[in-house]
Amino acid sequence: MAGPRPRWRDQLLFMSIIVLVIVVICLMFYALLWEAGNLTDLPNLRIGFYNFCLWNEDTSTLQCHQFPELEALGVPRVGLGLARLGVYGSLVLTLFAPQPLLLAQCNSDERAWRLAVGFLAVSSVLLAGGLGLFLSYVWKWVRLSLPGPGFLALGSAQALLILLLIAMAVFPLRAERAESKLESC
């Protein structure tokens, strides 16, 4: 018969979940704000959620396109808007996750824990959907060898969100065993 696990393991698991959430937030801030949503940023090609610049052979410069030209190139306005909504909405929902996580840990509140899991699950779906939709429209200009740091940061954030959801699905069973509410903080 196995005895109860030491409290430090539960606290270490919780702290690792909080650290992963903070890393996901930092990766998404880097990709979407610092890199301005650019997934490919090369001297002859810049493609992102707000930039669509292709190399012009005639003038030998980078020419940025706006919406009437983008629709002619095959990038629909509604599709790009939905991709932006998904990716940037994912960042917003991820920003709301740490508070319910902390409240759930301090108060042993399973509803707050489920709320945080919900925020992260919807965030993961929005990020995957927005990134997938965007890539489906720009795939003819972007190749696997061309992704920039913004794309790698968003891909890493998506992988970490999935890892977080798996870890959080296992964690609530351990969180309920706290001896008292005051000791769990």
Swiss-Prot record:
One Pfam family in the UniProt entry:
TM140
Task: Describe its membrane topology.
Answer: Multi-pass membrane protein
Indicate the transmembrane segments per the record: 12-32, 78-98, 115-135, 151-171
Which residues lie toward the Cytoplasmic compartment?
A: 1-11, 99-114, 172-185
Localization, per the record, is: Membrane
**Residue runs in coiled coils:** none
Question: Using the chain's own numbering, where are the disulfide bonds?
Answer: none
One CC-aspect GO term: membrane
Q: Which residues lie on this side of the membrane: Extracellular?
A: 33-77, 136-150
Query: Which sites does the entry annotate for glycosylation?
Result: N38
Keywords (A to Z) from UniProt: Glycoprotein, Membrane, Transmembrane, Transmembrane helix
Tissue specificity, in the record's words, reads: Expression significantly higher in gliomas than in normal brain tissues.
What the entry lists under PANTHER family is as follows: TRANSMEMBRANE PROTEIN 140 (PTHR16103:SF0)
Descriptive protein name: Transmembrane protein 140
Upper classification of the source organism reads:
Eukaryota, Metazoa, Chordata, Craniata, Vertebrata
